[in-house]
Amino acid sequence: MGHANIWYSHPRRYGQGSRSCRACSNRHGLIRKYGLNICRQCFREYAHDIGFKKLD
């Protein structure tokens, strides 16, 4: 059994390791509210395109 077979072979069905950003596949700073599943960096980039408006 080589290294490639062992690496990342554990099932990830729940927890932080199971979810990733739909834009950049990052796993940190994920916004899951409203089913966005997008990291905070990508959210700042795509918020206007999604339909979020910044209030004064």
Swiss-Prot record:
Keywords: Cytoplasm, Endoplasmic reticulum, Metal-binding, Ribonucleoprotein, Ribosomal protein, Zinc. It comes from the Eukaryota. InterPro entries: Ribosomal_uS14, Ribosomal_uS14_CS, RIbosomal_uS14_euk_arc, Ribosomal_uS14_sf. It is found in: Cytoplasm, Cytosol; Cytoplasm; Rough endoplasmic reticulum. It holds the Pfam family Ribosomal_S14. One of its GO terms (molecular function) is zinc ion binding. Binds 1 zinc ion per subunit. The keyword Metal-binding applies. Its cofactor is Zn(2+). Gene3D superfamilies: 30s Ribosomal Protein S14, Chain N. PROSITE patterns: RIBOSOMAL_S14. Component of the 40S small ribosomal subunit. This is Small ribosomal subunit protein uS14.
